[in-house]
Amino acid sequence: MNSLQSLCVLCSRLSECALELECLRFCDPVTLIPDMTNFRKNGVVIIHLFKTLFAELCHQNFNCASPVTIYLQILLKAMYNQVLLLDASIHQFLLDNDKQKYFENIFQLNECKQHLKLDLALNNYLTFSVDISTINDIEKLLCKMNCIFGLISPLDGINACSQIIEFLTILCGVCVVMKPEVFSETTTCLKCYEELSLVPNQGKSIRKRLAGKFCNHLTETHMVSNLEKNVDIIEKDLDFSTKQYGLVKEYMAKITNIFQQQLYSKPPHLQEAENTLINFDLFSKIPDTIYSLSEFTYWSKISESVIQKASITLNQLNLCHSLYADLQNEISKFLYGETIQDVFNFNEENVTNDDKLYIGSRFISPCRLVDIITNVSIKNLEEDPVFTKLAEEDEIQTKIKTLLNELENSAHETVPKKYVTHSMTQDHNLQQEIHIRKKAYYQKISESGYSKVMLCIKEQEALINKLMNINILGNHIFESLSKMMNAFANRQLQSLENFSADPFTYDDHLYIKNNLLSKKLPQELLPNLSQEMYRLLTGPLSNYHTASFPLSSNISMAYACDVADFLPHMKEDLAKCVEGTIYPENWMLCTYNKFFNFDGLHNINDMQRQMWNFIRELVLSVALYNDVFGKQLSIVKFGEETETVEKILLTFDSGSPLLFKRGTTTTKFNDLYSLLYFDLKTQCDPVQISQTKQVSHIPAPNLLDLCRQNENSIPECFYNF
């Protein structure tokens, strides 16, 4: 078993223990005191694991994070805190025997720690604060950090992610089941946007398309059904003596008998149609009437499935809740000698009926309640006079009955009946035509209104399902955190002092810059260079251009901007900046040793625009340099692996933003044009230059020392000066 497998096994075992530890919070402390020895043994194991692994996990995530290690760091810290809190609360309960105070301590009701004010520092020491209170806020902050990834120093970025992990420990605790107050079901995430990007937008903006969409990525909804029918599982867990105590056996029998009767039955016309169709199979001769009957039966079943009545009534669920509560009290009397009071029934008499509607029952599946609410809403709609009239004149039901009557009447006929008649053979009846058209118009209007109401009911049903069912913490937040932390870790320059320093002066910078200013960039290069700029600007969360089925870099950047709620005018500024131009004087704006320097800027928007300008100048200047001198310099982000021998590494670090790597030698630069001069100078071979005949050269290697082939065929007027 390798280390990753061992880590996964440990994570699985800890998750199992964490679930049991979370359940203890909801129990009556009276039930915990007799078994305190086992609790403390397990607590010692958790404390030992925390002291052994936690520091190493933090170090691992600081250098090379993964979703599993981040989750383990959160889980270990939360379990450690929970064990200490439980032990202290039980000890206090033994002294004062106050359950009210015990539950207040366990659930920390007198304090609120679910808020974080995160301070984020940028490259020019500009600091701003972000308020976080939900998982959605964390995901949105990561998306915004993704857009300004180049403006955040690696150390500040990793520290911010570490604070987020600490806050997740408080927010989530030991249980992966999320509390309703720690997430917003209608706030979408990056994955929601990715799903919408796969379907046509029908001319709607992304904000309109995302409005009303339920996010099932940050928290994944798990439907709980048939919880009330699992009395047989309880019966298997009880020993024989417990089953024979008091009314335990009687209560379990009553719960089992509640759901024996099913209230729903098919409509009579549908049952009769199915009995008729059962006589026809694949090899039978199918008359037109039978085919029509089958088709109308199909559509009738579809409509019945939409308005099908629930098989369990609200009275049955209320009775089930009462019987389960009585069964719990009987079992607790046998095991502990008294009726236990867990957190669910503690002060239950103070809960109003309206509150109970939101609280629900721990013995009843949320899906059952949602189904009942939905069907009651549909039933109330169908009792409206308009829809009652429509139900009486159900066209599909009428046609099925007509076809059944025709089949019965024509059972002894030898000649099949023709169902299609020519309209010109019928007498024209104006009043009948008006009545038919009016009825068709009313039918169309009614069906349209009914469809809209049904759509609204289904949307509300989806919302209630999201709220009432179990929501498990998804892995999307851990994946995003690990990607962000690894991207910052790759940018760390631990060995920066080992790199050679820039050996050139302002004259060298000016020499390259002045010579490039007299040239023009080929127009046909601009589209590819724009993609190159988008690639360098895109953060680690939206690198779709590196996927197995890659998208273009501009789409990756567009996704990042949309998810981070970029303002439209900022998107326009970015697009105009990246468009580029063939004239160097429009983009060569950086002064000597000021590349990626943001001094004097005190606004995030201005810093973003300045970063875009720096990236544009880097990409276009290197492209022009390659075109003029026949070079093949490439630009990559620091930490990315490429097979290129000569490359420029973009570090996004204000101290040393550029590194030039040739083979195993790396030199750091604060100036772009000094870097280009370094490449040009070190490529020249003075021995070859001195042996070249019939060509006049300046002794010192410089811009004019170009290597040409067949120089003897060049007229003297081009090189004699």
From Swiss-Prot:
Binding site for ATP: Y625, N626, D627, V628, F629, G630, K631, Q632
Location of this chain's protein in the cell: Host nucleus
Any one GO MF annotation of this record: ATP binding
GO terms under biological process: viral DNA genome packaging
Zinc finger (C3H1-type): 189-217
GO cellular component, as recorded: host cell nucleus
Keyword annotations: ATP-binding, Host nucleus, Late protein, Metal-binding, Nucleotide-binding, Viral genome packaging, Viral release from host cell, Zinc, Zinc-finger
Family from the record: Belongs to the herpesviridae TRM1 protein family.
Function statement: Component of the molecular motor that translocates viral genomic DNA in empty capsid during DNA packaging. Forms a tripartite terminase complex together with TRM2 and TRM3 in the host cytoplasm. Once the complex reaches the host nucleus, it interacts with the capsid portal vertex. This portal forms a ring in which genomic DNA is translocated into the capsid. TRM1 carries an endonuclease activity that plays an important role for the cleavage of concatemeric viral DNA into unit length genomes.
Record text on subunit structure and interactions: Associates with TRM2 and TRM3 to form the tripartite terminase complex. Interacts with portal protein.
Protein name: Tripartite terminase subunit 1
Lineage: Viruses, Duplodnaviria, Heunggongvirae, Peploviricota, Herviviricetes
